[in-house]
Amino acid sequence: SGGLDSTLALLVCVKTFDKLGFSRKGIIGITMPGFGTTDRTYNNALHLMSSLGITTKEISIKEACIQHFKDIDHDMTNHNVTYENGQARERTQILMDYAILKIR
């Protein structure tokens, strides 16, 4: 997301790959823009991934979240916990599924 937790996790991965002598291209940084993603955070994430020399991938979560909110009859103008958590859960689902896909 470009936030502090994501940034620190990425830096730990990079340091670990460097210590083990692995290519940083083996790290896949995924940016998942959603409804709250600002240009600043989006560009910060892209710049960080590029400057570290890792592989980058972008997967928008917007359409998946729209479908989810429709499925549960949630009004998207209501930016409550359901709205926020729906986006967080979609990101988690993508990361878990992508990781499993890549290790098989």
Place the predicted regions along the sequence by residue.
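A conserved beta-strand->alpha-helix junction
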Residues: 22, 26-80, 88
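Short, well-ordered alpha-helical packing segments
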Residues: 11-14, 45-49, 96
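Long hydrophobic segments that form regular secondary structure
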Residues: 83-87, 91-104
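A phosphate-binding catalytic loop at a beta-strand-loop-alpha-helix junction
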Residues: 1-21
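Conserved helix-loop functional segments at active or binding sites
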Residues: 15-22, 67, 74, 97, ...
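Short glycine/serine/threonine-rich phosphate/pyrophosphate-binding segments
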Residues: 6-9, 38-40, 92
